[in-house]
Structures are given as C-alpha cells and as structure tokens.
Amino acid sequence: GIAVQELFDVLGVDSDHIAIRTSYYSSMGERNDSVQVYGLSYLIKKLESEDSLLIVDDVFDTGKSIDQIIFDLKTACKKNTPEIRIATPYYKPSQNKTDRQPDYHLHETDKWLVFPHELEGLSAEEIVQNKPELKDLLDKITPKL
C-alpha cells in the first residue's frame, strides 16, 4: 500500500489511496466460505456518488474478495456509492466464482503465482534458498537452520 502511494506521489497523480484487507479464515484458523473485509470505514465516510473508485488487487482469481468489498461498500454507502472499477495485474478467469471480472488486467493465467514479497507457507530453509538476502535476518530471529 505505501509503495503504491509513493508511486502516485512521484507521478503527480492526485489520489486518496488506502489499503483494504480481506480474510477467508475464522479465528480458529479454519477457512470460511465468507470473506471478512477490514478497513472500509474511511471509504464509507469519504465516498460520494460523484466519486470514482478503483479497487486494485494483485490477483483476481475467485473474485470473492472483490465481490464482498463491493457488496459491503454498496450496503454502507447506499445512494453515495461511487462508480467502482477493478484492476489487477493477473486475472484467472477459470477460477472466477462471481459474475464480476476486472475492468483492467495485464495477464490471464491459470498458474499458481508466488510473488517476491511472499513468505507465508515457506519453511525457513525455503526462504533462505529462494531469498538469500534474508538469511542474516532469519539467523537473528530463528534457531540455526
């Protein structure tokens, strides 16, 4: 989120950018069918019907996260709901479980994607193997590998 805002600032793009988080997991760590959305309160207070909102996600696969975000916004904003568009670098049409699709995308794929910033699900050994620049940090915060 911060990197996006910095890019907008450097490019001189006037924006009111915020990060929204979604989760499919309950407090017990089990996957839910419903999506939990966090961080909409600022948008709900600020949005007006004449505004335009671009929702950007790293991957549009099932579409459930974006669908829930838009549902929650429309429910809360009512007549103040702005025009909403969706952008993503990666679109997985074969995985889409909604009637939505992104307005803008760069690539269509059905492959599993792993982004350079992702660490979740990797063992310490896999992190060191694939991201050797993190070894010194890992050595300080975890037992020897």
Ranges and model annotations:
Residues 1-145:
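PRPP-associated nucleotide enzymes
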